[in-house]
Amino acid sequence: MISDWGAVHHTKEAAHSGLDLEMSVTSDFDEYCMAQPLKKAVENGEVDEDAVDEKVRHILWLMLSLHMFDVDVERKTAVCTERKRGSYNTPAHREVTLQAARESVVLLKNEEGRLPLEKGALKKLLVIGCNADKIHSNGGGSAEIKALYEISPLMGLKTHLGGNCEVKYVEGYYREEKQEDGTNWQEDSLKDGGGTGRQEEQADAETARKRKELLEEAVRYAGEYEQVIFVGGLDHEYDVEGRDRADMKLPYGQDAVIEAVLEANPNTVVVMVAGSPVEMGRWEKKAKAVVWSWYAGMEGGNALAEVLLGEVNPSGKLPESFPYSHMDCSAHCVGEFGEEKLLHYREGIYVGYRYYEKQDVPVQYCFGHGLSYTEFAYHDLTIEKQEDAAEFYVNVSCIVKNTGNRVGKELVLRYGRE
C-alpha cells in the first residue's frame, strides 16, 4: 500500500494500518513519518519489527513483479536485469481509449427526441463554448499525463461531419487564466492547520467587457443557425487537486451565456465537460437536451461526436448523484465546509446518495441516471436468497429487451438497503 503524496501525518497509526510506502513532497526524507520516526517507534516497542519486515516483503514483491530485478535462487541474491520496455499509443490502446470514452458519455436529458442530430441533413452547425476547443488531458495537478494527442469536441465534430457541413465556432464566454501564487499546497498540508484553499471567481471590468462581447456574438449567431451545440463546463482551474471550489456554479459567466443562447435558439444542445457536478438550475428546464461528457481522454472528442450524431447510442450512467446546489451536500449541511482548512467529516458514512436518501433531499440527477436513444423493457425478475451460518447471498436476475429501433446497451443496476 502506497500513500498519497504528503498524506501521512501519524507514524504509528500509518504503520498499524497497513501502509507500506510513504510518499511525500519535501526533501527532508529522514523526517518522513515512515523514516526515522518509524525507526524510533520500533526501537521504543511501539511498532513491531515483524510489521516492518512485512512491509519490505510487499515492496520487494512489487519490484520483482515489475522485473526491476530477478532472484538468483542458488546464491539467494538479487540480480539486476534490463527491464522490458512496454509499448504505448498502439492502435489497440487507442481503440480501448475510444470505447471507454463512448461508454462514459451520459445523456442526462433528451426531450422531444432532440438528439441524435441527423447527420445526413446537417448542413450548418454552430458550436459555442471554450470547452469545445480545449483539451484537458494535462490533468489537474498530479493527474497530469503526457498525452501524444487529444481530440477536442470541436475537432471530433468536424472530423465526423466532413466537408458536407459548415461548422462555425465561437467562444461564447471569456476564460481568463489564473495566476499561481507559488504555494506548495501539498507541503502546506503537512503543517498544523494546513490544507486546501478555496477557489473563488473574481472578474474585473475588462473581463466583464470581454464576456459581454462574446455573449452578444454567441446570441447573434445562435439566432441564425438551426442547429446549435453549447460545450461548456469546468476546466482544471476549477477541477483540480489542492483546492476546493467555493460553490458548484459554472465559472466564466456561462450560466448567462447558456440562458441567452437558449432564448435565441430553444433547440440548443447543452454539453457539459467536467469532472464534478455543477449547478444547472438557471437553464436546465429550458434545455431540451443535456449531455455530460466528463474529461474523456485522448479520443473524447470523437466519442462525443459519435454520440451527438447518433453513430453511438449513449449508455453511460452517473457514478454519483448531482445535487441542485452545493448547499444540498452533507459537508455543507453539517457546517464542515468553509474557510477552515481542518475538517472533521462529521457526516460519517452519509455522503452522496446515502445522505440524500436518509435526509430525503431531492437531487438534480440521481446516482445511476443515464438515458438512451432506444428503450429497454425489463421482465422475468427473479430474486433468490441463499443463507447459511457464515454468509448471506441474494441472486437477482432478469431479462432485458431492446424495444426501440436503435442498437443500444443497457446497464442493469440493482439497489439494496437494510
Briefly describe each language-model feature range:
Residues 1, 10, 254-258, 268, ...:
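Extended, hydrophobic alpha-helical segments in both membrane/secreted and soluble proteins
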Residues 1-29:
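Short acidic/histidine-rich active-site segments
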Residues 12, 30, 40-41, 45-141, ...:
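Secreted, periplasmic, or luminal enzymes acting at the cell surface/secretory milieu
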Residues 136-139, 232-251:
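Glycine/threonine-rich flexible loop motifs
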Residues 158, 258-265:
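Surface-exposed amphipathic alpha-helices with a cationic face
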Residues 218-221, 283:
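Structural alpha-helical scaffold elements that stabilize or flank donor/cofactor-binding regions
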